[in-house]
């Protein structure tokens, strides 16, 4: 493969007015316009908007779900094979790493997990325990088998494949292209097939806009759900009214934290918040294990992880029940795929000085393993309580959804008030970390060259908070619709990520 002619200075052909501001007004304007249009349509025509989104979601899942499953699986295997080649010793850039390994991995982990790191970790295993995944049919004979299958399915949705698409091959392509003068923007993922032409092509503009909208949808959704979930939790714990005013206060606090964090930059706010988040998660995980049952959690992890590895390929590409898949695996894979381009930009930016092997191991191996442990602690403890007292967790999930599972687990532990409060705090910090990191990546995607301005970073954080606050005014439907929209945007993003599968190994060889 002949390497495309590099563009030494992306600024060379940029219009002077755009360069002076550093802002790509076309990309920023179109992206903001689409977000505003979606919010306005949701408020003015909620039923029509919901029908359009649901139809688009169903079509995307039906026609592209299998493609996403195989794309994520192939990406993971290519990345792992690449990690064991001599080329993996190549560094992503010259100089020493900008962050310590702990800070670096913390930033990567907290950005992806968001609120799902708490609520889905507790709720998804329970959901699959109550209604076993169709992959297993009627083969699950005991409660232990059901628990292992429930955890294994959760690991499929949040495990190795989800992490591999976010920060491995795409980050390698972006880093290599950036060394040739390309910007840290989603369009750079097309560098392997378009070269420098993508800089000023309408295709590049479309790539940037689609990637930005996907991440906005995937971030505003958790922010809005956070308002609903924390408001519910506060009402359960303290009696504070679970109403729109409480939800707005929660969103305002989170948005303020994210805006301040992203304004202070990578070296201050973002990495400090990520590190604090990880320590709080470790403390809470230890508390749940000690106050619950360490023995049960350990056995649950071994059973779930063993089932996951033993059925890894089969579960990852399972096609037997399209309706069920669209609500679980395909939904999550589409969501993570939508995050792929901007996560690749973010990971590439914070991974300067790291080797390719470091990048792959610390993105596609360590975080997903830690995620399975985390899901085993929260979800496994919930399953244990459900086995001991049927309905104590499952009934709460079926009646009140995600936040009810976390609070019902906390309520059955000693020091329930303290543990429940820690869960809510951790959820806020998780979502705030995702919001600040993705605000940085969105701002970077709207910037022609160099670092995005502080004002632009903060503006995107505030804008996503405002969008979430407006959408929850019409209830769960507005936020759910936006989260479904990310699956629709995953259709073009899936093709945007495809060149990395073939180009990353070639670029790794050239970097070695």
Name every feature range the model reports, one short phrase each:
Residues 198-206, 210-354, 361, 366-420:
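Membrane-embedded translocation segments of transport machinery
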Residues 25-32, 59-75, 111, 146-177, ...:
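Extracellular loop-to-transmembrane helix junctions
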Residues 34, 67-83, 281-292, 370-380, ...:
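Hydrophobic alpha-helical segments of multi-pass membrane transport proteins
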Residues 15-21, 45-60, 79-98, 149-156, ...:
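Membrane-water interface regions at transmembrane-helix termini and the short interhelical loops
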Residues 11-19, 51-57, 84-102, 126-151, ...:
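Flexible loop linkers connecting adjacent transmembrane helices
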Residues 18-43, 76-78, 114-117, 157-225, ...:
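Helix-loop-helix module between adjacent transmembrane segments
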Residues 20-30, 88-106, 295, 299, ...:
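C-terminal membrane-solvent junction of multi-pass transporters and transport-like membrane proteins
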Residues 2-144, 500-512:
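N-terminal alpha-helical transmembrane segments of multi-pass membrane transport
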